[in-house]
Regions:
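Acidic/aromatic-lined carbohydrate-recognition and catalytic surfaces
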Residues: 75-111, 123, 129-141, 145-152, ...
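The substrate-binding groove and active-site-proximal loops of carbohydrate-active enzymes
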Residues: 206-220, 268, 385-398, 461-479, ...
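Conserved alpha/beta catalytic core and glycan-binding cleft of carbohydrate-active enzymes
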Residues: 334, 547, 551-695
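Active-site neighborhood of glycoside hydrolase catalytic domains
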Residues: 396-413, 477-564
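Substrate-binding/active-site clefts of carbohydrate-active enzymes
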Residues: 417-480, 484-487, 491, 506-522
Length: 745
C-alpha cells in the first residue's frame, strides 16, 4: 500500500531497532538502554514477538509506549495490565514453552536435512512418525542424542517431498504434533520467463466495460481483455485489482483492498450471460434477465463515476432467476463437488452473507455481528429458514470461480506465459465474513493494521483491518494462509502481494490509541514464504512482492533469496533510494533483475496526468496538502525535470521534447516505457490507462468519499469511454505495445 509518492505506508519507518546499547558513546541513541531491556514488560513483549522500538524514516530511534505494548499484548490474549499480571503472563509463557515437546510449525527446505531439538530428555521413551500430505508414512528420519543439550535431535532426511506434512512425537506417553511446511528453497522462475524478459498490462478490471456489461467491468470483460491482450499486443500477463469477496448486497465497499473475505471471490463481477444455464432459460425468464441488463446497460457508455450499487441491484436478481431455473445432472454434480472441495469456510461465508441480507449490514444499530456467533442457535435457525438464500450464495461462488477459471484458460489458450496476475490485499474488513466466522484467527479487542508516522502521514495511518494473530497461525500450521494462497493460484499464473513487508511484521494499532501509538508485531516469514513457494511451484506460477518505500535491506534480500520478485516503479526509483524530489533517477541498467518494473502504480494518476501535474491539482482541490501548494508544485516540477533529465541522458527523448512536456505527452509516456525495456527486470508492466491516454486517477490515497476512488471508468485522453472490444485496436495502445515489444524506440 503506497501513498501518492510511492512510499509504502507501513514500511516507511525503516527498521526495527538494534537492541545493542550505544547511547553511552555520545552518538544519537539508536537502541534500547540496558535499563529498558531489563524491564519485565519489555521482556514479555519481546517474548511474544513485539518489537519494543524501531528506527523511523528519518533514522530516529523510537520507543514503543507502555500503553501500546500493554494493549497489543492484550490483543494477543496476554495480560500485562499490572506488574503482577506481567509476572503471571511471563511465568505462564515459560511453562507453556517448557511443556511443548516440539514447535507447532516446522519449516523444512526440500533437498536439505531438517533438524528439530525435542524438548525432553534423551533418556526418555521416544517414538516419532511423519505422515505425508497424501496420507502415506515417511520413515527417513533419525533420533540422536545431543550431548551438549542432553535433549534428542530429530533429523529429517533431505528427500522429504514438497508439501504439508505432520510430525507426531510421543515421549513417555505424552504426544506432540507439528505441521511441517516442506518448501523449495526458491520459487523457480518459469522456463518461458527465464528465457527472456516478459511484459504485461495492469488494469482495474471493473473500469473496462463492453456493451454486454452491467455498468461495471466483469469476468466476461476480463476474458476478452486477456485474449485480446495476448493476440493483439503479445502481452504475457495482466495484473488486475484484487477480486476478493465483497458484501452480498448494497452498500458495497468500492475499494478492492478492503474485502469481506480473502478466501472467496467477488461475485459482483459475474457475467450472467456467460452462465451455461442462461442459454437454456425459458423465454419469459430470459426476457426478465435481459430487461434487468438493459436497465443499466446505458451506463457502459458513460465516463462519469460508476454506480456499483446500481449495477449489483440489477444483476443480483438476474442471477437469482438463473439460479432458480436449476441445472442438469452433470452441472449439479459439478456444483456439489465445488461445495465439498471448498469445505466449511464456504458455508461460513454463505452464512455471513445470509445474516447480512436478512439482519442488515453489520454496523450502525445492527449488533448481530457482535452478539451472534456462527454457532449461535439463532444463526442456525436462520440458515434453516432461508436455506435457498444460503445455497444461492454458495452457488454465486461456484459461478465466479468458473468464470475466473475460464478467463485464465482463455489467456493461456491465446499464448500468454502467465495469464492472470491476481493481487492479494493486506487484510479484510473488520466487520466482514472472515472476521465474524473465525474471530480466533485475528487479533482481538479491535486492533487494526496501519503504519506509524512518516514523511507524508505525520499522524500515521489506520487501515481499519484486523491483523492475523501470529500465534494462531503458528498453532494451526498456517492452514488459513495455505487455503487462501491456494485459492488464488487456482485462478492465476502469478500473485502480487500488496505490502509484502506484512509477511515479516505489521504495525498493530490498539483501539482508541491512534495510529501514532502502535507497535510492530513480527510474523514467521519463513512459514508464509514456504507456503507461497509450495503453491507457486505447484501452479508453475510466480510471486511478486510490493516492496515500495523504505523496506529494510534484509527483507528484500530474504525475498530475493526465496524467488519473490520485487517491485520497481520509475517514478520512485531514484539513485541511492533518495526520497528527495529532484534527485536523479536510476539508469535502467541499475534496476533489479528480480523485479516487476513499471512506470506507475494504481495509487498515482496515469502518466499523462502525472506529467501534467494532475496529482498537484487534485490534492489541492481535495485539501490534502500539508504544505503550501506552491511548495508541493515546486517539488513536482523538480521531480518531472529529473525524469526528463534521465530520459535525455539515456537518449530516449531530445532536450527539445524535455523542454516542452505538455506538447509531447504521448512521446514521453512511450519513452518512459522504452526505458523499462532496457532494464534487466524479468517482468515489465504497462498500465492500460497509459495505453489509452487517460488522465484521471483511479485512487487518491488519503481520501474516502471525497473522491470517486475505484469507480472511474476507462476513458481516452478526450474523456471518451473505451470499451473492452476496442481497447487493443486503438492506435495509441498498439503503439505502446510495440514499445513494450522493443519494436519501436
Amino acid at each position: 500500500m503506497t501513498d501518492a509518492y510511492g512510499n509504502d505506508a507501513a514500511t516507511s519507518t525503516g527498521t526495527i531497532a538494534d537492541t545493542t546499547n550505544n547511547a553511552a558513546s555520545g552518538a544519537p541513541q539508536r537502541a534500547e538502554s540496558t535499563e529498558r531491556l531489563a524491564r519485565p514488560l519489555i521482556k514479555l513483549a519481546k517474548a511474544c514477538g513485539l518489537a519494543t522500538s524501531f528506527i523511523d524514516q528519518l533514522g530516529t530511534y523510537t520507543e514503543i509506549s507502555d500503553a501500546a505494548l500493554v494493549a497489543v499484548l492484550k490483543a494477543l490474549d496476554v495480560d500485562a495490565s499490572s506488574d503482577e499480571a506481567i509476572v503471571r503472563s511471563m511465568t505462564q509463557l515459560e511453562v507453556e514453552n517448557s511443556k511443548r515437546l516440539l514447535p507447532s510449525t516446522i519449516v523444512a527446505t526440500t533437498g536439505k536435512p531438517t533438524g528439530i531439538t525435542l524438548n525432553c530428555s534423551s533418556d526418555a521413551d521416544i517414538t516419532a512418525s511423519i505422515e505425508l500430505e497424501d496420507g502415506t508414512a515417511f520413515g527417513h528420519f533419525a533420533l540422536l542424542p545431543n550431548l551438549n543439550s542432553g535433549k534428542p535431535d530429530l533429523t529429517i532426511a533431505p528427500d522429504l517431498p514438497m508439501g504439508y506434512h505432520t510430525l507426531t512425537v510421543t515421549v513417555d506417553g505424552r504426544e506432540g504434533k507439528a505441521a511441517i511446511i516442506a518448501a523449495p528453497a526458491r520459487i523457480p522462475v518459469p522456463e518461458a520467463v527465464a528465457e527472456h524478459q516478459r511484459w504485461g498490462w495492469m488494469t482495474q478490471m471493473y473500469s473496462v466495460r463492453s456493451r454486454e456489461s452491467w455498468g461495471i467491468g466483469d469476468y466476461g470483460d476480463l476474458k476478452r481483455l486477456l485474449a485480446d491482450a495476448a493476440e493483439k499486443s503479445k502481452a504475457d500477463f495482466m495484473l488486475i485489482n484484487p477480486i476478493h469477496a465483497g458484501a452480498p448486497i448494497p452498500p458495497l465497499e468500492p475499494s478492492p483492498y478492503l474485502p469481506e473475505s480473502r478466501r472467496f471471490l467477488n461475485v459482483t463481477y459475474i457475467r450472467p450471460q456467460d452462465i451455461p444455464e442462461y442459454a437454456t432459460l425459458p423465454a419469459d425468464v430470459r426476457a426478465q434477465v435481459d430487461a434487468l441488463h438493459d436497465s443499466v446497460a446505458a451506463r457502459n457508455d458513460e465516463s462519469t463515476p460508476m454506480d456499483i450499487n446500481a449495477a449489483w441491484e440489477a444483476k443480483r436478481p438476474a442471477l437469482r432467476l438463473i439460479f432458480e431455473a436449476g441445472r442438469n445432472n452433470k452441472r449439479e454434480l459439478e456444483f456439489e463437488h465445488f461445495k465439498t472441495t471448498a469445505g466449511p469456510d464456504l458455508d461460513s461465508f454463505a452464512t455471513w452473507c445470509l445474516c447480512f441480507e436478512v439482519w442488515g449490514a453489520p454496523w450502525g444499530e445492527n449488533r448481530w455481528f457482535f452478539e451472534k456467533t456462527i454457532d449461535d442457535p439463532a444463526v442456525r435457525q436462520l440458515v434453516e429458514e432461508h436455506h435457498d438464500l444460503f445455497e444461492f450464495n454458495r452457488w454465486l461462488q461456484w459461478i465466479a470461480a468458473e468464470q475466473v477459471n475460464a478467463a485464465q484458460q482463455e489467456a493461456l489458450d491465446h499464448g500468454m506465459t502467465l495469464g492472470l496476475m491476481q493481487d492479494m490485499a493486506v487484510g479484510v474488513h473488520g466487520l466482514g465474513a472472515d472476521a465474524w466466522a473465525n474471530p480466533e484467527r485475528f487479533a482481538s479487542g479491535g486492533v487494526t493494521v496501519g503504519c506509524p508516522p512518516d514523511f507524508y502521514n505525520q499522524q500515521g495511518q489506520d487501515w481499519g483491518q484486523p491483523p492475523f494473530n501470529p500465534r494462531y497461525l503458528e498453532a494451526t500450521g498456517y492452514q488459513v494462509y495455505r487455503e487462501m494462497v491456494h485459492s488464488m493460484y487456482e485462478h492465476a499464473g502469478a500473485v502480487r502481494i500488496d505490502h509484502v513487508l506484512g509477511l515479516f511484521r505489521l504495525w498493530w494499532i490498539p483501539q482508541g490509541l491512534g495510529a501514532r501509538n502502535g507497535a510492530y508485531v513480527t510474523y514467521n516469514h519463513e512459514a508464509m514464504l514456504g507456503v507461497l513457494a509450495i503453491e507457486a511451484t505447484r501452479a508453475g506460477g510466480m510471486v511478486v512482492g510490493e516492496d515500495l518505500g523504505t523496506v529494510p535491506d534484509y527483507v528484500r534480500r530474504i525475498l530475493a533469496d526465496h524467488g519473490v520478485l520485487g517491485t520497481d516503479v520509475e517514478w520512485f526509483n531514484r539513485v541511492d533510494d533518495s526520497p528527495n524530489a529532484g534527485d536523479p533517477y536510476r539508469a535502467p541498467k541499475d534496476y533489479r533483475k528480480q523485479a516487476l518494473a513499471s512506470v506507475t502504480t494504481h495509487d498515482l494518476p496515469p502518466t499523462a496526468g502525472y506529467l501534467n501535474f494532475a496529482h498537484v491539482k487534485l490534492r489541492e482541490e481535495l485539501h490534502l496538502l500539508s504544505e503550501p501548494v506552491e511548495a508541493f508544485a515546486a517539488s513536482a516540477t523538480a521531480e518531472r525535470t529529473a525524469m526528463m533529465n534521465r530520459l535525455v541522458e539515456n537518449g530516449y527523448i531530445s532536450q527539445t521534447v524535455a523542454d516542452d512536456v505538455e506538447g509531447h505527452v504521448q512521446e514521453i509516456v512511450e519513452a518512459m516505457h522504452a526505458m523499462l525495456t532496457d532494464t534487466p527486470s524479468l517482468l515489465l508492466q504497462a498500465a492500460l490507462v497509459d495505453g489509452v491516454g487517460e488522465c484521471r486517477s483511479q485512487n487518491q490515497p488519503g481520501t474516502s468519499r471525497e473522491y470517486s476512488n475505484w469507480r472511474v471508468p476507462l476513458a481516452d485522453s478526450s474523456g471518451h469511454v473505451v470499451h473492452t472490444d476496442e481497447v487493443f485496436d486503438l492506435p495509441r495502445v498498439q503503439s505502446l505495445s510495440a514499445v513494450m515489444r522493443r519494436e519501436k524506440r
